[in-house]
Swiss-Prot record:
Alphabetical list of InterPro entries matching this protein: SmpB, SsrA-bd_prot, SsrA-bd_prot_CS
GO CC term (a single one): cytosol
An example molecular function term from Gene Ontology annotations: RNA binding
The family this protein is said to belong to: Belongs to the SmpB family.
Major localization class: cytoplasm
Disulphide bonds in the chain: none
Keyword Cytoplasm: yes
Lineage: Bacteria, Pseudomonadati, Pseudomonadota, Gammaproteobacteria, Pseudomonadales
Stated name of the protein: SsrA-binding protein
Species the sequence originates in: Pseudomonas entomophila (strain L48)
Compartments in which it is found: Cytoplasm
Residue span of region Disordered: 132-160
One GO-annotated biological process of the protein: trans-translation
Length: 160
């Protein structure tokens, strides 16, 4: 009997810009409808989520702006579109909750990360409210002060 291959674990791609641009209020886990070449590319880690977002229409969720680079060894029979829209699989209750929240002013739905869950590829999407420029500066200032505090705590223990 052939030896089973282990699936890679962990995160495939992250959207770090979304954490900077939005106040994240709630996160959801969604499945993705992918073709074979896309799964192969994701195994190789060839994905980018920068500027990707989720559009809700007709009771379905669609992932826009994600880029999955096709492998050179992929099939030549299928024309690979790296930035095609991909359907997200969510429960009906989750879709209704997202649609109600996005209908409010200032709320949007963004893709945060792609990751492996057992043998399936999942997309973490988040409901967020856009930050203003001064909010972004406050976040950076707060992060820097926390780093400085941690640094002094580490150094204080070494001095004794």
């Amino acid at each position: 009997m052939a030896k089973q291959k282990k699936h890679p674990t962990g995160t495939i791609a992250q959207n770090k810009k979304a954490r900077h641009d939005y106040f994240i209020e709630h996160k959801f886990e969604a499945g993705l409808v992918l073709s074979g070449w896309e799964v192969k590319s994701l195994r190789a880690g060839k994905a980018h989520l920068t500027d990707s977002y989720v559009l809700l229409k007709d009771g379905e969720a669609w992932l826009f702006g994600s880029h999955i680079t096709p492998l050179t060894t992929a099939s030549t029979h299928v024309i690979a579109d790296p930035i095609r829209t991909r359907k997200l699989l969510l429960n009906k209750r989750e879709l209704e909750r997202l649609e109600a929240a996005v209908a409010q002013k200032g709320y949007t739905c963004v893709a945060m990360s792609l990751y492996w869950s057992k043998h399936l590829i999942k997309c973490e999407i988040a409901l967020g409210k856009g930050k203003k420029e001064f909010d972004k500066r406050d976040t950076v200032r707060e992060r820097d002060s926390n780093r400085e505090l941690q640094r002094t705590m580490r150094n204080k223990g070494k001095e004794e």
